[in-house]
Amino acid sequence: MQKFDKAMLKKEIENNARKLFRRELTELNEKEAFHAVAAAIQNQIIDDWILTTKRAEEEDRKRVYYLSMEFLMGRALGNNILNLSAHEEIKEVIEELGLNLSALEDAEPDWALGNGGLGRLAACFLDSLATLGYWACGCGIRYKYGFFKQQIVDGYQKEVADDWLKDGNPFEIRRAELAKEVRFGGWVETVQEADGRLRFVHKGYQSVEAIPYDTPVVGYDNHIVDTLRVWDAKAKETFSLDEFDKGNYQKAVESANMARNIVEVLYPNDNHYAGKELRLRQQYFFISASVQTAVDSYVKKHDGDVKHLADKVAFQLNDTHPTVAVAELMRVLMDDYHLTWDEAWEITVNTCAYTNHTIMAEALEKWPIELFSKLLPRIYQIVEEINRRFCEDVRKKYEGNAEAKIAKMAIIYDGQVKMAHLAIIGSHAVNGVAALHTEILKKQELRDFYEMYPDKFSNKTNGITQRRWLLHANPELAEWVTEKIGDRWITDLSQIEKLAVYAEDKKAQSEFMAIKRHNKERLARYIFEHNGIKVNVDSVFDVMVKRLHEYKRQLMNILHVMYLYNQIKDHPEREFYPHTFIFGAKAAAGYKTAKLTIKLINSVAEVINNDASIKDKIKVVFIEDYKVSSAEVIIPAADFSEQISTASKEASGTSNMKLMLNGALTIGTMDGANVEIVKEVGAENAFIFGMSSDEVIELEHNRSYKPMDIFNNDQEIRRVLMQLVNGFYSPEDPELFRPLYDSLLNTKESDVADRYFILKDLRAYMQAQEEAVKHFQDREWWARAAILNTAHAGKFSSDRTIEEYVKDIWHLDKIEM
């Protein structure tokens, strides 16, 4: 954006009202006014967007393509205004027009392109890449309905389509001229050329057109604008008039429906074959389109020479979903650009890098050979050859022990195509996302690969963008921080450490706690508006917001709430500090245990919140449809940050970082990035409990853990567990929560009881909670510790993470603007 002109922006917004809605701005409703303003803001961004690309091309900058199934962007309007170099003037214009910026922001739906931490990390990374001045493109799918909109009906999660695009997205630009063909099914014929080389011809395939939609990613106050490119799918032939005229109405639109299915939802239920096939189809669809575009764009700028691609292009594979990129890049280089296998392989390995986000075996994707080879016949041929050559390398390296190694390391084995193995073998760099996670990968899950390729492995601890999670989400605290230490923290979070000197300052403590109270009041209003529950602003706001999964142990949290309720009922005479438990979580549609846990939380809430005898000492709140925009209200208000995953199971976590930055204290296990948070802030300013990762791994190996011993020997825990099956929280169906009870205590041969050691850690968790509540009542101690948490969050900026990727993996140079 060049010199900012307030009068021109004002006029443009008014003109947009007429152009888009044929009415005056004053006559528009909130949603319409949002579109009029957003279109004008997009116009302010365009010049910088074009100039960024122009400069990057002139300077021949290397570009990173961040390939991810998810981008959990939140809303764009407020973020774009904040990052623009003229954000104060823009706010003034909006107010002078009689509009309310926060109401306009609320009129924008959250972008339904992601679900959990994986997608939010990708969004934070894009913000950091643009702010740091690197040339980047995020590549994903333009989901029509996203993951789902969560409704809570009678305490149960109900999944409803999230039709976020129904009014259009004013920040996206359709780039039909850059459409790519993606092929599915069919077969491959081998043709020998005159020079003896083999050519592979894909025949009988279904063709889908991938159409890119580009949205701007605005760097903070630096005129750099990167791109998020998401792909829409369209059949080559959308309508068969011939079939229609014959009365075959379904068949007439069959191709169109097949293409449309690819982009309908994020993570379709894969409990059945059709769902599995659709997931693989989605992954290949956006990867093929993105890889083709990246290679073609590079070749066009470099006089048709593809051999130095790795010098100017980097593909970062965000988890296992995009790992088919390894084989697709090989296909493009060999089939479209006629390179030899060895030439193509060297380029591919040097271009691709893989981030592992989990040690959970079920999350490391595998595809049945029959499905993979049928849907992607040419890609399967390439994967077979990569696997054959890799197995040969293993045989040479481990002569005496080769077959045992191959059984553990092959890409294709036991009827499955293992995508994490393809990613590791086909990348020059493999990273974990927290120090503990990376060590577990090297010593446990990926040990054989680490032995073979030690130089590929490194750690890149995750981070968050302070611009979204402090400057935007908590403007009052952000202003206070700037008043104390200046504003350099906005682009260099290490500066926030300077706040530590204010931790003992009584005036600063009182200011900090007043800001926290204002944020709690805002959240209390939100809860009353959305849940109809009145919460005590002076109570502890105990927050657990994250995907619902057994290893994250939301169940342990609610069991503790049930225990507290019993204590209050048994001892009404005891002093008990008021406590508000706040949950936000979505469960995958096919994940029965997770969905039943949501029902339990809501059933417990129903009983406790309606029991007048406990005088509001406990309240339980489940925030429906947890998303970025609700996180921006919840996180600044939190007192306790619940990070209670089974040690060794959480790769990193990022809600722990967001909550820490906003002055919440961690109650958690030594897992994921918690380990590094405790190192930064000091164990005395957090509440750590439970087994270590080594202890968990040891118990898993020796299988000596017997949860029934706890049931038999701890009367209070036994009582809580019995309330799951005696109808206490479900009088209409006493057996409703039996599956949760069984998961904790079932000792049938086929099952492992209490797989995530909830009962093993429960007593320690209760003690940590008690300790935290005791400290919370010492307001001076708490204020000091809260300020120190904010002050020591500097390491956890995604800016730091990105600079590590740049230095060790991508080797990018900044764009000079």
Annotate each PLM feature:
Residues 1-817:
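A conserved ligand/cofactor-binding region detector
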